[in-house]
From Swiss-Prot:
One of its GO terms (biological process) is carbohydrate metabolic process. It comes from Streptococcus pneumoniae. It is a peptidoglycan-anchor. The keyword Magnesium does not apply. Residues 79-90 have a biased composition (Polar residues). This is Pullulanase A. Residues 48-61, 99-113, 122-133, 1212-1225 have a biased composition (Low complexity). The gene is spuA. It catalyses: Hydrolysis of (1->6)-alpha-D-glucosidic linkages in pullulan, amylopectin and glycogen, and in the alpha- and beta-limit dextrins of amylopectin and glycogen.
Length: 1287
C-alpha cells in the first residue's frame, strides 16, 4: 500500500558539493529536518459536502443526463456500469434543511441595452478537463436561458450537473443522474455555461442547483426570476450567489451608464466615499466614460477594503457652472457588499442593481386578505412614502370599476402594503396596480379563514353496518364536487359518480345509501376519490380525512389523474382489530425523563434473511414486528418509536413482499416514509395484504396491543412539515393549505408543500389527525419531523388535545430553527428556542450529538468519544440537560442522543472519525469501545435518552457489494455514500458507507440479528448490546439519572473534573461528575475517552467515592455491583481508568450495595434473548475479535491531591442546600476546600497556579528541540565560513 505523506514528511535532498563543505551542509540540513519535525502535522480530511436535495424531484428528464451512478436497480448490483436512477422518494435532513431558494426581484418590462460585448474580468483557470472551450460566448437561442458558473464545486466536471425545475421546458427527474451534465458545458473567459430551454414566453422563474452523481447538492437550491421578457442569462459567482450581470473581481465596482441618444462625449463621473482613489482633479474634471461594455459605457472603480458605500455625480463637462451636473442631487450607493455592478440611465434619478433598469420598489403580488383589506407585496419599501404609494396605486373590481382606497399601511420590514377599502366581493378577484406593475388578487388563506373556517365533522363516516356513508369535504372555491366510487375488488373500475351538495362555510356534503342508485348495499371496502371542478378545470383528489386507502403504487402516478394520488377506502376502524386495545401501562415510566426511546423502522426490524426461518408472518410487516418484540422488552426500553407508518408516496406497496437482498442505495422499493400522502391512513407497505384496506388497521392495532402487553409504549413519527406533492392539498383548495409566498403562491419543501399550520383548516387537519391516531390506535406519543417548521401554537394545541385522551402521552420533535411560515409573517416557532416557554414537548439536542460524536456541519471530524478534545464544561452542561445552543428550563425538554436514522450510524461515524478500518480486528474492537463510551454517556445523562435501532450492537450500513470493495469512478459512486479512508489515506476494505439509506435495499438497511444476539459469532457486538441493556437497567434502578427539575440538578449534580485542575485541560477527553439521588445514594460517572490511561484525583471533597461499588466497567454495566471490575484501579490519589474506559460508581446510603455483586467474567459471556445463530460467520461478515487497543502508553498523571476545585465551582457547591446527611458531608468537604482557595483566582487564569499543573512535556521538548536546531545551524554556518576562509 502506498502511504500518503503528510506535510512534515516531505523528503529533503541536499547536494554536498565537496568533502570540505560536507560537514556544514549536513549540520544545516539536520537542523532543517528537525525544524520540520517541530512543525505541527496538518492532516487533510476528505471533504464531505452537505446533502441538500432539491425541491423538485419527480418531473421530466432533461435531454443530456449525468453519467449514471453506481447504485443499481437491485437486479444486477455487481455490474457497476448498469443504469440505476434514484427513486424520487423524499429525503429529510435532520442536521439542517435545504437552502432556501434565492428570492429574486419582480419581473420588469424594460430590456437592457445591447451595445456590445464585454469580458473584462480575469479568466478563471479550472483544474477540470475541458470538453468544449470557447473564449467568446455563442449567441443564446430564442427561448433558452444561459447560466454562467464561475467555477464548479468539484474538479470532475463530467460527474456534475445542473438540476433544474420551475419554468423550464423539461424539469429534471431521476435524482441525481437526470441533471444536465457539465460534460456538455462550454467555457468562456468567465467560466462554464449551460443553456436551459424554457417552457415558453410565460416562463418567469428558473430554479436550479449543481449536484454530482453521488447525490450531493453542491450549491444549495438557487433560483432566478426573469426581470423582463428578454432577460436570458444569469451568473453564479465563486460562492454560487446569483446575479443578473457578470460579477466583477473583488475590490471593484463597475458603474455602467447608458444613454439612449448614444452621446457619451465629455460625460464623466465624479466619485468619493469607500473608494481607493476618489476624484481629486480640478473640478469638474471627472473620470470619462470611455470603455464600452455590454450595457453602454462603464468605469471600473477600485474600492477600499470592506467598502460599503460610495457617492458620485454624473457630469457633462461640455457645460458650465452648476449645469455640468446631469442631475443636481448627489447619487449614493450603499450596497457594495452585495453588488459589484450598478446601472445608470440618462438622467434617471435611480441607481439600478440590474441591467434591465427595473425599479427597486416594485409590486410583486397581491392577495385579498379580508373583506376590507388587500395586501400587496413589494420588492422593497425602504424610503417609501404613504402619499407616493396612494398616488401611484389603483384597484379595480372584476367589472373594471375603480374601488376607492380609503387608507394604506406600509410595513417596510415585511415589504408589504395593506390597502383598506370595501373589498366585500369574495367571489371575484380584484386588480391592483402600482406604476407599471399590475396583479390580479389571489384569495388569501386569511380571507378564507375569516369567511369559511369550519369546525364540523369532515371525512367519510361509515354507518349502519356499511349501508350508509356520510361525506363532508371542505373546498370553498370549488364550483362543483362529486364523489367517484370504485369497485372494492378492482380499484380502477368506476362504479358510479354522485354529486355532493354545497353546505355551510365552504363545505360539500352527501349521504351514500341505497337511494344513490350505485347498486351497493354494503359500502365497506369500496374506494373513492373526490372530483372537483373549479374555474373550468377538473381534478381528482384524495380525501384528507380518509381512514384507509387502496394499495398504492407511485410508479402509476403518471398514468392519469385517477392514479396520481391514492384512492380512499370506506372503513370503520372501530370494528377492526383487538377490541381490548387500551392505553398502555408502561413499566418504569411516570414522566418524560423516565422514557428510554428506541427508534425502529418496521421493515428493517425483520428483513434480515437470518431470521426468515424463525418468522411465522411475512417479513417487514406489523405482524412480523410483533414476533421480535421480546428483544426490545429484554433490552429494557420504555417506548418504541416507529419511523413513519402513515401513507407515504414513493413506493410500490404491491411488491412489499419482495426481499431486496442485493446491495443498492437507490432505485429500491424501500422508503423511510418522510413523503406523506395522508395523515389518517396507514401505509400498506407493512400490511400482510396491502390490497385489503382493513387489514393494515387491524394488524397495526394488534402491534400496539402487543407492545402494551409487554409494558412498553408506542411513539409515531409524523411528518406534517411537508407533503410528498404540493398538488395533494392544492387540488383540494388552492392557495390555502400551505404556507404562502408574499405573492400568494404555496411554499414548498423537499418537493412537496410546506403545510401552513397557522391557517385554521390546516391546523385542524394536524390536530384532528393526532386526536384520531391516539383515540383509534391508543398510541403513547409522537415525534414531529422538522418540528421547527411549525408554529408553536399548533404543536401545543395538538399536545393538549392528545394528552386529554392519553394523560401519559409524550411528544418530541426536531427543533431545528427552520421556520419559514408565510412570507413576512413571523410567529413563534416550535423550535429549540421555544423550550424556555413550554414544558410540554421536547426537542433533540444537536449540541450533545455534535460534541460527543460530531454532526452537522462537521460530521466525521473527531469529537469527544472519537479522540477530539472538547470543552469539558460544555460536555458537562449537555450531560445535565443544559445544552449550550438553546435554553432548556426543564431536563425533560432535552432529548439526549448521538444517533438516529439520518446520516451515518454511530458505528460508521466512529470508524470515519478515527480513520480506522473495521475489517481489522484491533480497529473493530476499538470502535466498539468508543461506541460503549457514547452509549454510557447518553444513558446516564439527565433528560430523555434516545437510541437508534442497532445502536446497541454497532449497526453498520457498509456497502458490501463486491463490485465496490475498492473505490470506483466518481460517476459510479453509490448514492448517499461516504468513502472512508484510514489515516494514511488508504481506502477501507469496502470503503463506501451509506449515510442516508431512505432509498437503499434491505441488504443495507436490515437489523442484523446475528450481530445483535449471537455471542459466539460476534462477541464484541453482543457485548455492546448487553452493555446497553445494563445501562438501561442502571438508569431505571435510580432517580439519579432522571431528575425532574433544573433546581434538582443544580443541587445534586457536581462536576469533579474541573478544567484547570488536577491535569484536566479546558478542552479534554475526560470527564467525571457526581450525582446525589433523592434517596441519598451517591453516583459518580467517569469517562476516559483518551487513548491512554488517565487518573482522576478525588481529593477530599470526593474521597467518599473510594467506598463505592462499581456498576459499570470496560466490559459490562448494570444495577448490580461488579466484584472484579476491569479497566479501572484505585490509586493513592483517586481512580485510574484505562484508555477508552468509563465507569459508574455508587455509594449507597446505608454504605452497602443494593444487591449481591456480580462476578466479572473474563470474556463477559452475553445473554441470548432472542435469536441464537450458532452457524459460522458468513463470508462477508465483520470480524468480532476480543482484542483491545494498545493501553500500554504512559499514564496521564494528575497533579497532587492538594489542588482544589476552582472558587466558582466551590462556591456554587457550598451554596447548595443539603438534602441528605451524606450529601451534606460531601458539600461540607467541598466548602472547606473552597475556603482554603478563597483568596486565589481561578486556576486556569493564574500563572502561579498554572505552574502547579503537570507538564505535558510539549513545552520543554519544544524548547530543547529549537535549542538543538539553533546549535546545529550555528555549527554548520561556522564550518562553512571556516571553509570559505581557507579557500
Amino acid at each position: 500500500m502506498r502511504k500518503t505523506p503528510s506535510h512534515t514528511e516531505k523528503k529533503m535532498v541536499y547536494s554536498i558539493r565537496s568533502l570540505k563543505n560536507g560537514t556544514g551542509s549536513v549540520l544545516i540540513g539536520a537542523s532543517l529536518v528537525l525544524l520540520a519535525m517541530a512543525t505541527p502535522t496538518i492532516s487533510s480530511d476528505e471533504s464531505t459536502p452537505t446533502t441538500n436535495e432539491p425541491n423538485n424531484r419527480n418531473t421530466t428528464t432533461l435531454a443530456q443526463p449525468l453519467t449514471d451512478t453506481a447504485a443499481g436497480s437491485g437486479k444486477n448490483e455487481s455490474d457497476i456500469s448498469s443504469p440505476g436512477n434514484a427513486n424520487a422518494s423524499l429525503e429529510k435532513t435532520e442536521e439542517k434543511p435545504a437552502t432556501e431558494p434565492t428570492t429574486p426581484a419582480a419581473s420588469p418590462a424594460d430590456p437592457a441595452p445591447q451595445t456590445g460585448q464585454d469580458r473584462s474580468s480575469e479568466p478563471t483557470t479550472s483544474t477540470s478537463p475541458v470538453t468544449t472551450e470557447t473564449k467568446a460566448e455563442e449567441p443564446i437561442e430564442d427561448n433558452y436561458f444561459r447560466i454562467h458558473v464561475k467555477k464548479l464545486p468539484e474538479e470532475n466536471k463530467d460527474a456534475q450537473g445542473l438540476w433544474t425545475w420551475d419554468d423550464v421546458e423539461k424539469p429534471s427527474e431521476n435524482w441525481p443522474n437526470g441533471a444536465l451534465s457539465f460534460k456538455d458545458a462550454k467555457k468562456d473567459d468567465y467560466g462554464y455555461y449551460l443553456d436551459v430551454k424554457l417552457k415558453g414566453e410565460q416562463a418567469k422563474k428558473i430554479s436550479f442547483l449543481i449536484n454530482n452523481t453521488a447525490g450531493k447538492n453542491l450549491t444549495g437550491d438557487k433560483s432566478v426570476e426573469k426581470l423582463v421578457p428578454k432577460m436570458n442569462e444569469a451568473w453564479l459567482d465563486q460562492d454560487y450567489k446569483v446575479f443578473s450581470y457578470e460579477p466583477q473581481p473583488a475590490g471593484t465596482v463597475r458603474v455602467n451608464y447608458y444613454r439612449t441618444d448614444g452621446n457619451y462625449d465629455k460625460k464623466s463621473l465624479w466619485y468619493w466615499g469607500d473608494v481607493k482613489n476618489p476624484s481629486s482633479a480640478q473640478w469638474p474634471d471627472g473620470t470619462d466614460f470611455t470603455a464600452t461594455g455590454k450595457y453602454g459605457r462603464y468605469i471600473d472603480i477600485p474600492l477600499n477594503e470592506a467598502a460599503r458605500e460610495f457617492g458620485f455625480l454624473l457630469l457633462d463637462e461640455s457645460k458650465q457652472g452648476d449645469d455640468v451636473k446631469i442631475r443636481k442631487e448627489n447619487y449614493k450607493f450603499t450596497d457594495l457588499k452585495n453588488h459589484s455592478q450598478i446601472f445608470l440611465k440618462d438622467d434617471d434619478e435611480s441607481i439600478y442593481t440590474n441591467p434591465y433598469y427595473v425599479h427597486d420598489i416594485r409590486m410583486t403580488g397581491a392577495q385579498h386578505v379580508g373583506t376590507s383589506s388587500i395586501e400587496s407585496s413589494f420588492s422593497t419599501l425602504v424610503g417609501a412614502k404613504k402619499e407616493d404609494i396612494l398616488k401611484h396605486s389603483n384597484i379595480t373590481n372584476h367589472l373594471g370599476n375603480k374601488v376607492t382606497i380609503t387608507d394604506v399601511a406600509i410595513d417596510e420590514a415585511g415589504k408589504k402594503v395593506t390597502y383598506s377599502g370595501d373589498f366585500s366581493d369574495t367571489k371575484h378577484p380584484y386588480t391592483v396596480s402600482y406604476n407599471s406593475d399590475q396583479f390580479t388578487t389571489k384569495t388569501s388563506w386569511r380571507l378564507k379563514d375569516e369567511t369559511y373556517s369550519y369546525d364540523g365533522k369532515l371525512g367519510a363516516d361509515l354507518k349502519e353496518e356499511g349501508k350508509q356513508v356520510d361525506l363532508t369535504l371542505w373546498s370553498p372555491s370549488a364550483d362543483k364536487v362529486s364523489v367517484v366510487v370504485y369497485d372494492k375488488n378492482d380499484p380502477d373500475k368506476v362504479v358510479g359518480t354522485v354529486a355532493l351538495e354545497k353546505g355551510e362555510r365552504g363545505t360539500w356534503k352527501q349521504t351514500l345509501d341505497s337511494t344513490n342508485k350505485l347498486g351497493i348495499t354494503d359500502f365497506t371496502g369500496y374506494y373513492y376519490q373526490y372530483q372537483i371542478e373549479r374555474q373550468g378545470k377538473t381534478v381528482l383528489a384524495l380525501d384528507p380525512y380518509a381512514k384507509s386507502l387502496a394499495a398504492w403504487n407511485s410508479d402509476d402516478a403518471k398514468i392519469d389523474d385517477a392514479h396520481k394520488v391514492a384512492k380512499a377506502a370506506f372503513v370503520d376502524p372501530a370494528k377492526l382489530g383487538p377490541q381490548d386495545l387500551t392505553y398502555g401501562k408502561i413499566h418504569n415510566f411516570k414522566t418524560r425523563e423516565d422514557a428510554v426511546i428506541y427508534e425502529a423502522h418496521v421493515r428493517d426490524f425483520t428483513s434480515d434473511p437470518a431470521i426468515a426461518k424463525d418468522l411465522t408472518k411475512p417479513f417487514g410487516t406489523f405482524e412480523a414486528f410483533i414476533e421480535k418484540l421480546d428483544y426490545l422488552k429484554d433490552l429494557g426500553v420504555t417506548h418504541i418509536q416507529l419511523l413513519p407508518v402513515l401513507s407515504y408516496y414513493f413506493v410500490n406497496e404491491l411488491k412489499n413482499h419482495e426481499h431486496l437482498s442485493d446491495y443498492a442505495s437507490s432505485n429500491s422499493n424501500y422508503n423511510w416514509g418522510y413523503d406523506p400522502q395522508n395523515y389518517f391512513s396507514l401505509t400498506g407497505m407493512y400490511s400482510s395484504d396491502p390490497k385489503n384496506p382493513e387489514k393494515r388497521i387491524a394488524e397495526f392495532k394488534n402491534l400496539i396491543n402487543e407492545i402494551h402487553k409487554r409494558g412498553m409504549g408506542a411513539i409515531l413519527d409524523v411528518v406534517y412539515n411537508h407533503t410528498a406533492k404540493v398538488d395533494i392539498f392544492e387540488d383540494l383548495e388552492p392557495n390555502y393549505y400551505h404556507f404562502m409566498d408574499a405573492d400568494g403562491t404555496p411554499r414548498t419543501s423537499f418537493g412537496g408543500g410546506r403545510l401552513g399550520t397557522t391557517h385554521h383548516m390546516t391546523k385542524r387537519l394536524l390536530v384532528d389527525s393526532i386526536k384520531y391516531l391516539v383515540d383509534t390506535y391508543k398510541v403513547d406519543g409522537f415525534r414531529f419531523d422538522m418540528m421547527g417548521d411549525h408554529d408553536a401554537a399548533s404543536i401545543e394545541e395538538a399536545y393538549k388535545a392528545a394528552r386529554a385522551l392519553n394523560p401519559n402521552l409524550i411528544m418530541l420533535g426536531e427543533g431545528w430553527r427552520t421556520y419559514a411560515g408565510d412570507e413576512n409573517m413571523p410567529t413563534k416557532a416550535a423550535d429549540q428556542d421555544w423550550m424556555k416557554h413550554t414544558d410540554t414537548v421536547a426537542v433533540f439536542s444537536d449540541d450533545i450529538r455534535n460534541n460527543l460524536k460530531s454532526g452537522y456541519p462537521n460530521e466525521g471530524q473527531p469529537a469527544f468519544i472519537t479522540g477530539g478534545k472538547r470543552d469539558v464544561n460544555t460536555i458537562f452542561k449537555n450531560l445535565i440537560a443544559q445544552p449550550t445552543n438553546f435554553e432548556a428550563d426543564s431536563p425533560g425538554d432535552v432529548i439526549q442522543y448521538i444517533a438516529a436514522h439520518d446520516n451515518l450510524t454511530l458505528f460508521d461515524i466512529i470508524a470515519q472519525s478515527i480513520k480506522k478500518d473495521p475489517s481489522k480486528a484491533e480497529n473493530y474492537a476499538e470502535i466498539h469501545r468508543r461506541l460503549r463510551l457514547g452509549n454510557l454517556m447518553v444513558l446516564t445523562a439527565q433528560g430523555t435518552p434516545f437510541i437508534h435501532s442497532g445502536q446497541e450492537y454497532g449497526r453498520t450500513k457498509q456497502f458490501r457489494n463486491p463490485a465496490y470493495r475498492t473505490p470506483v469512478a466518481e460517476d459510479k459512486v453509490p448514492n448517499k455514500s461516504h468513502l472512508l479512508r484510514d489515516k494514511d489515506g488508504n481506502p477501507f476494505d469496502y470503503p463506501y458507507f451509506i449515510h442516508d439509506s431512505y432509498d437503499s435495499s434491505d441488504a443495507v438497511n436490515k437489523f442484523d440479528w446475528t450481530k445483535a444476539t449471537d455471542g459466539k459469532a460476534y462477541p464484541e457486538n453482543v457485548k455492546s448490546r448487553d452493555y446497553m441493556k445494563g445501562l438501561i437497567a442502571l438508569r431505571q434502578s435510580t432517580d439519579a439519572f432522571r431528575l425532574k427539575s433544573l433546581q434538582d440538578i443544580k443541587d445534586r449534580v457536581h462536576l469533579i473534573t474541573v478544567p484547570g485542575q488536577n491535569g484536566v485541560e479546558k478542552e479534554d477527553v475526560v470527564i467525571g461528575y457526581q450525582i446525589t439521588a433523592p434517596n441519598g445514594d451517591i453516583y459518580a460517572v467517569f469517562v476516559n475517552a483518551d487513548e491512554k490511561a488517565r487518573e482522576f484525583n478525588l481529593g477530599t471533597a470526593f474521597a467518599h467515592l473510594r467506598n463505592a461499588e462499581v456498576l459499570a466497567d470496560e466490559n459490562q454495566a448494570g444495577s448490580v455491583g461488579i466484584a472484579n471490575p476491569k479497566g479501572l484501579e484505585w490509586t493513592e490519589k483517586g481512580l485510574k481508568l484505562n484508555a477508552l474506559t468509563a465507569t459508574v460508581l455508587r455509594v449507597s446510603q446505608n454504605g452497602t450495595s443494593h444487591e449481591s455483586t456480580a462476578e466479572e467474567k473474563p470474556d463477559s459471556t452475553p445473554s441470548k434473548p432472542e435469536h441464537q445463530n450458532e452457524a459460522s460467520h458468513p463470508a462477508h461478515q465483520d470480524p468480532a475479535p476480543e482484542a483491545r487497543p494498545d493501553s500500554t502508553k504512559p499514564d496521564a498523571k494528575v497533579a497532587d491531591a492538594e489542588n482544589k476545585p476552582s472558587q466558582a465551582t466551590a462556591d456554587s457547591q457550598a451554596e447548595q442546600p443539603a438534602q441528605e446527611a451524606q450529601a451534606s458531608s460531601v458539600k461540607e468537604a467541598v466548602r472547606k476546600e473552597s475556603v482554603e482557595n478563597s483568596s486565589k483566582e481561578n486556576i486556569s487564569a493564574t500563572p502561579d497556579r498554572q505552574a502547579e499543573l503537570p507538564n505535558t512535556g510539549i513545552k520543554n521538548e519544544n524548547k530543547l528541540l529549537f535549542a538543538g536546531i539553533s546549535l546545529l545551524a550555528l555549527l554548520g554556518l561556522g564550518f562553512l565560513l571556516k571553509n570559505k576562509k581557507e579557500n
